[in-house]
Amino acid sequence: MSNSKKLAVDKYGIKNATVRYQLSADELHQETLDKKLGVEASSGAIAINTGKFTGRSPKDRFIVKDDITKDRVWWGNINIPFEPEKFDKLYEKVVAYLSSKEIYVHDGYVCADPKYRTNIRTITELPWSNLFALNMFLRIEDSELDSFKEDWLVVNAPGFEADPEVDGTRQANFAILNFTKKIALIGGTGYTGEIKKGIFSAMNFELPVFRNTMPMHCSANVGKDGDTAIFFGLSGTGKTTLSADPNRHLIGDDEHGWTPENTVFNFEGGCYAKVVDLTAEKEPEIFAAIKKGAILENVIMDDKGVVDFARTDITENTRVSYPIYHIANIQPGSIGHNPKNIFFLTFDAYGVLPPISKLTPEQAAYQFVSGYTSKVAGTEVGITTPQKTFSACFGAAFMPLHPAEYGKRLAEKIKETGVNVWLVNTGYNGKMKRCSLKDTRALITAALTGKLNNVEYKDLPIFGFKVPQSCEGVSDQSILNSENTWEDKAQFSAKLKELAESFVQNFNDKKFAEGASADVLAGAPKL
């Protein structure tokens, strides 16, 4: 049931609002139905449409430039500066818009390690946005509500549109972080991922700057012997899918911290998974998690409420959010210890990288700072086919600091712990076909269980990665060498060189070398 406590929101500038405070998942589900803002799928999940925006809008993400951020944030096309005065005026407009409305307030927190707990209060215009916050943030006990004090405030108003000429935004929608006032202000977009990624970006600044902790855009799980594995990768590369392993306990699927005390903790209390082409056979854990309490976004259903996950009429970026306990085998407390294996997941649009290769510490640091992958259809506005990109730290869109800052921290962690680092291509081979999920799982299982420790390896030309020549459970051993999937071997060599050159060009264009250590530079391709 909802909490009986009355919550005053006047202190935020919201006047005469009807406040629905700390509603349960069932109540928010019913509110969404009653207001005709969603429909119930046959699975019991609520299905909603996020409106005009079905993905993040990176060009409309801003950080207030002030005394805390001006000399620390890596300003540019990713971290776009916003004037403090403009923020204050826009905030006043948003809270005036929410005044006299029925609004929803949820209190939760991020960072599962108690030492790093950060309280989040989320104020939303819509009930399903509040259900998203309930699903995605860690849940607090009712006994904590009376003494709850937020460290960050999220204000989410999809129905409010900015006036770019007056408000300083690019267009009507915006997502702005203010590190002095600790407010994430979101307007003009109903895409729920802006709530999640706003707080993720905030932690990606605060944890390294103030808490000496490495934030990571990754999933993580734990084996039966307590061995932690980390999976880095951009949206659509397989983080959520590959970390949902029936033989391992899930710590989390997207955002984690790696502490000086050698813990790896989940930031979140839920999962936000892509569901395009989802089947119970391919991804049984995720499929089973879609039940009452979950939110399906922008999917197509028949008149009986059965979802057709193959349909992308609205967007390629169909999604589900659900609380982590919808997954059967989760790690108690969402905390693990130093990882034994790290996997960099990349979608190689060139089709030249092998399905798995082992990296030296230097290569790992270089690959991490480079963050090569392809933007997969639907995850951002306007992306309909895979496009080559370099997203530093496998999550540049959410990283306020210079990539070298994060790269330095990861390199130190790798050296301290001796962790194995693997590059996994979940994208194309030479036939422009994706490696099957079954084969990718077999490769990762082999790495996790030590079955790749004593096999023969060969070097990938130019890059120098170690490529295993055999792997138990893979349907066709020949695919382990990416060259074998190309009919034209000369074209393979040319494309491999072209990709290597693009790595070097990216490093030069972004001036990464200026902040990178000699170890990182030693991991570059040898042209």
Regions flagged by a language model, labelled:
Residues 242:
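Hydrophobic positions on the alpha1 helix immediately C-terminal to the Walker A/P-loop
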Residues 3-42, 52, 217-234, 245-246, ...:
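Glycine-rich, often acidic-flanked micro-motifs
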Residues 239:
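Conserved lysine of the Walker
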Residues 151, 158-208:
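Charged, amphipathic alpha-helical linker segments immediately N-terminal to NTP-binding catalytic cores
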Residues 106, 213-220:
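A short glycine-rich, hydrophobically flanked beta-strand micro-motif that places a catalytic Asp/Glu
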Residues 1-147:
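N-terminal accessory targeting/assembly segments
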